[in-house]
Structures are given as C-alpha cells and as structure tokens.
C-alpha cells in the first residue's frame, strides 16, 4: 500500500468467492486457468467501477520466458503475452513495463526498497505448471547458459499478431 500511495494511487481490496468456486465447487487438480480467468474478470469489473482504464502488471522477463515455454509444452504453439494489451470487453489497457527486468532484479528492488510482499495463500502454490516451467527453464539455462536470453530474444522478435512492431528488436 505504501508504494501505491506514494505513487498517488489508492490500494483497493476486493472480496470474491473465487477460492470457493475454484477449490470447493470445481475441485480441479490444476485450477490455475479457471482461477486466473475469474481473478481477471473480478479485477476488470472493479477497475470499471472505479473508472480506471489502465493497469500495469508486474510480469517480468522470467514470466515472459516461462509463458513461452508453457505455451510450447502444453499448447503446441509459440506464444507470450504482449507488452501492451487492450481489452475492449473490459475497456482496460494492460501494460507490462517490467518485461525486460529479470525476476531477480525485481526481487532485489523490492528488498532494497523495503516493500512488503503479500504471501501467496493459494493451496497449489509451488506445484503449478508455471512452477514446473520455471524449474525446467532454470535447469535448461544451467545446462545451456544464455538460453533464457535467447528465448526472450525469440519472444520479442517473434511474429505475434497482437504484438505491436515497436516492441520488436
């Protein structure tokens, strides 16, 4: 909250029934996709109620790489979320300003600034497909140094229909 207030923004908390829906009603072993959709839906609805039309996600370089790897493994396609996305159904623009910052760089900044991190209370945290992709990518990068950078280069220079030309090297 202190960082948000320092930037002139207001921290807002929204109570939902998402955990109940995902873990009690649905009971899927891998509930991440449904949970993400419900969280985004609730967030976009709340942004609309507050008259907010732009949000910055904290996706970092490692998130982009892991998403590309997950796409290849689980969907058979090469994809990563675009740096800027306009969601017409929500009237919201999503920006990802930290896409070139490694996760360790973000973590170091958080520590150096004394920013308090909210612990993830999800019951499947640490055993998700994303966590698997993260560990796999770390192993691949240890065995083949520079792989992360090459994958990020491929992501940035890939030809994704929803990526503007300006974000390509």
Named regions from a protein language model:
Residues 19-21, 64, 127:
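Generic structural signal for helix capping and beta-alpha/helix-loop junctions
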Residues 23-24, 79-169:
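ATP/NTP-dependent adenylation/nucleotidyl-transfer catalytic domains that generate, transfer
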Residues 26-32:
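Surface-exposed cleft-lining segments at the edges of enzyme active sites
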Residues 1-11:
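Single conserved hydrophobic/aromatic residue that forms the stacking wall/gate
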Residues 9-26:
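A conserved beta-strand->alpha-helix junction
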Residues 16, 60-62, 122-123:
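Short, ordered loop/turn segments at secondary-structure junctions
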Residues 33-105, 151, 168:
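Active-site adenylate/phosphate-handling loop in enzymes that bind or generate adenylated species
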């Amino acid at each position: 909250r202190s960082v948000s207030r320092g930037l002139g923004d207001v921290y807002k908390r929204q109570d939902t029934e998402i955990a109940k829906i995902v873990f009690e009603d649905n009971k899927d072993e891998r509930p991440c996709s449904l949970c993400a959709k419900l969280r985004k839906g609730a967030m976009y609805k709340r942004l609309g109620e507050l008259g907010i039309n732009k949000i910055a996600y904290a996706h970092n370089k490692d998130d982009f790489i892991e998403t590309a790897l997950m796409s290849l493994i689980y969907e058979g396609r090469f994809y990563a979320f675009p740096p800027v996305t306009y969601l017409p159904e929500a009237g919201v623009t999503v920006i990802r300003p930290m896409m070139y910052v490694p996760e360790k760089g973000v973590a170091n900044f958080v520590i150096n600034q004394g920013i308090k991190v909210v612990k993830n209370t999800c019951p499947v945290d640490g055993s998700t497909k994303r966590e698997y992709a993260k560990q796999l990518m770390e192993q691949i990068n240890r065995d083949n140094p520079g792989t992360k950078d090459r994958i990020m280069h491929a992501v940035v220079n890939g030809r994704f229909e929803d990526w503007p030309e300006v974000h390509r090297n």
